Amino acid sequence: MDLEGKRLLLSGATGGIGRAIADRLAGHGARLVLSSRRREELESLAGSLPGGAQRHEVIVADLADAGAAEKLVTDAGDVDGLVANAALPASGKLEDFSSTEVQRAIRVNFESPILMARAIAPRLAEKGTGHLVFISSLSGKVASPRSALYSSTKFGLRGFAFGLREDMHPHGVGVSIVSPGFVRGAGMFHDAGSKPPPMIGTTTPGKVAGAVVRAIERNRNEITVAPRRQRFVAEIGYRHPEFAAWVQRRGGAERIASELAAGQADKR
């Protein structure tokens, strides 16, 4: 799908990755409906994008609230596509989460993208064009210590996107999943004040944003955004989970995961 003049809804717009996606989409001519929980940051972002606040709209929404996903789509009105980027950090041992925190993580990371797609997809099918992009993670391909809750949402989102892609194909609507690895300067490690594992490399918000554009313009099924070594490890983990678990135990994954979970505890 050509992005010029298309109107897209972007959730999670004010985080580091969200801002990069917004800037790249706007640079390719898209008109954006930007959403997050913070109005001031949304308005600042809209004003900084190509075309400015006159071209891009903002909607404040907390997708952890019941009914927020459907209301966001209603408020956004007629759109040509969705980039579902909003997510909550959810690293930690399962028993350390309250039931409310479990529900919030599932609602934001998994349920809300599904409900937004459910509301938007029929409209796109009627038009015979459009695109839905879901931002996942390498945690949707391979699990690691203290990732049970987070990985469950990302594994689920990946499967949902693949299934929906098949359903929407006859209607001319594209569906893509974009799975970043460790992102420097943004993402869960940056937000938690933790360092990603050494010697495995990182990617950038700009590369994630570029993958979103490629996914839409070329109707790509899945794009993994990570250095070659990281992609290789993830692929091994996906195909051989027992071997991947052994490698992670030898490589200090438990310590790294503990640091990450500690940094995320107040952000759930």
Predicted regions and their residues:
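C-terminal helical subdomain
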Residues: 177, 197-232
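Conserved glycine-rich cofactor-binding loop
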Residues: 14-15
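Substrate-binding pocket helix/loop in short-chain dehydrogenase/reductase
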Residues: 93-106
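Conserved glycine-rich Rossmann-like NAD(P)H-binding loop of the short-chain dehydrogenase/reductase
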Residues: 28-45
